[in-house]
Amino acid sequence: KRPLLKTDKFDGFIIGFQPCRPSSRGNIRLLSKEINDEPLIDPGYLSNEKDLYDLECAYDFVRKISQTHSLDNIIDHPIGIDLIKSSTKEMISHFRQNATSVYHPCGTCKISPDKNTGVVSDRLKVHGLQNLWIVDASVFPNITSGNINAPVMMTAYIGGNLISEDIKKLT
């Protein structure tokens, strides 16, 4: 199920690229009211023109690097599809079919003072509900440019204080 986690049994290297701040947005939909039913998750990869432009720029850069004298001498053959010799249209099609996340999805319950543009308030309380807070990476209004561990810990620290304050007001 997760082919990227399998170790290859041959020598090779990868020239990769990824957007640090993609503009494309996906969505999560509940298919039923049953708690054990899985939601429908559409990550929406490459659904934004800016992300497609960034992909083309990165692809052109990798193509140029791959054709330098230094790498030309060590590249024997591509593994799988030869993206270096593919057209931009073929490359985009390949990426649409194969692109995945680097396992740090976030931003599905955005912080916003307005319930029409976000799920939680600046106190991390779910709009329209009482005594329900969300304190994880889903509240990020923007995707960070790096690993989300530190921002999640900061959110948890601040969220814990906010929840404590709110509960004290209730008692």
Q: Can you name each region flagged by the protein language model?
A:
Residues 1-151, 159-171:
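FAD-dependent oxidoreductase catalytic-site/capping-region signature
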Residues 156:
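ATP-dependent carboxylate activation and anion-phosphoryl transfer catalytic cores
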